[in-house]
Structure formats: structure tokens, C-alpha cells
């Protein structure tokens, strides 16, 4: 009987070890957080982004363009999760599932003109209020021309 209990406990331990870790966004501290790419202070939290690395560290960004530059340089392999602020709600949303809108006239901290929203409906509402733009998905951002847009 003890042998079977040990086997069951061992199996439970193995299964618990296989559970996927969950990652949560951390609070941005404007006084101390700086963008990993451009070293600017995170003054405009409504446009901030962050990557939770699998090792527990966080990389912070002041604009989606800087976050994407980091991913391009480092790949996605060590990313546990990535978050960007929803431009309409000022809430954290998943970078990989967000809907993006580009308009060269949208103001963003690094002048990339790309904002993130949680749905196509929210993106359309944003464009109605702020001016027409180009709808983009995460995969589109990977090929986007990220220079500072004028």
C-alpha cells in the first residue's frame, strides 16, 4: 500500500511540475522605470509595454515600437508573456492578441503612431474618435517599418 501511495504522490508531483506558469503584468513605477531600448522614463503609462521573461525578470518599454525592437533583437524564446496598455481603457492586454491601429498622426511617446486595443470593435471606435488608421495584428508588427514616423 505504501508503495502505491508513493507512486501516486510521485505522479502528482510530476504533473504539478508540468503545469504552465502564469505571468502577470507588474506595476510601472514612473519614478524609476526606464525603457529597455531608448532609456527614456516611462512618463506616459497609457502607452507602456512590458515583457515578463521566463526567468522572472521584466523588461519595460515606453512604446510598442520599442517593445517590438526588443523582440526582433532577442526573439520570443525567453518570453513568458508580453503586455501592452490598451489605449482606450489604460489596462494591460496581451501583446500577441491585441489589435493595433497605425496612423502617422497618432501621438505616442516615440512617435511610432501605433496604439493597441483589445478588439477590432474597440479599434474601430478609436479610429472614429481619433482619426482613421490602418488595422494591424501582432504578425503585421513583425514586418512593420519601425523608424520614427513623421
Which sequence ranges carry the predicted segments?
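Short, flexible, mixed-charge glycine/proline-rich loop motifs
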Residues: 24-31
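Bacterial signal peptide processing site
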Residues: 19-21
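Post-signal-peptide N-terminal segment of Sec-exported extracytoplasmic proteins
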Residues: 31-76
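C-terminal motif of bacterial Sec signal peptides marking the signal peptidase cleavage site
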Residues: 14-17
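C-terminal partner/receptor-binding element of secreted or periplasmic proteins
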Residues: 118-150
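Mature extracytoplasmic domains of secretory-pathway proteins
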Residues: 59-94, 99-100
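Positively charged n-region of N-terminal signal peptides that target proteins for export
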Residues: 1-4
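Short aromatic-glycine-(Arg/Gly/Cys) micro-motifs in beta-strand/loop hairpins
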Residues: 44-55, 93-109
Amino acid at each position: 500500500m505504501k508503495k502505491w501511495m508513493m507512486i501516486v504522490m510521485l505522479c502528482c508531483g510530476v504533473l504539478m511540475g508540468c503545469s504552465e506558469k502564469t505571468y502577470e503584468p507588474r506595476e510601472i513605477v514612473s519614478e524609476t522605470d526606464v525603457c529597455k531600448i531608448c532609456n527614456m522614463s516611462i512618463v506616459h503609462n497609457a502607452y507602456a509595454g512590458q515583457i515578463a521573461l521566463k526567468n522572472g525578470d521584466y523588461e519595460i518599454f515606453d512604446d510598442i515600437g520599442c517593445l517590438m525592437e526588443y523582440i526582433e533583437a532577442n526573439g520570443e524564446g525567453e518570453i513568458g508573456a508580453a503586455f501592452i496598455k490598451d489605449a482606450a481603457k489604460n489596462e494591460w492586454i496581451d501583446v500577441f492578441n491585441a489589435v493595433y491601429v497605425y496612423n502617422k498622426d497618432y501621438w505616442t511617446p516615440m512617435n511610432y503612431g501605433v496604439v493597441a486595443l483589445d478588439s477590432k470593435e474597440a479599434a474601430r471606435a478609436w479610429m472614429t474618435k481619433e482619426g482613421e488608421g490602418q488595422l494591424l495584428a501582432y504578425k503585421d508588427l513583425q514586418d512593420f517599418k519601425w523608424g520614427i514616423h513623421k
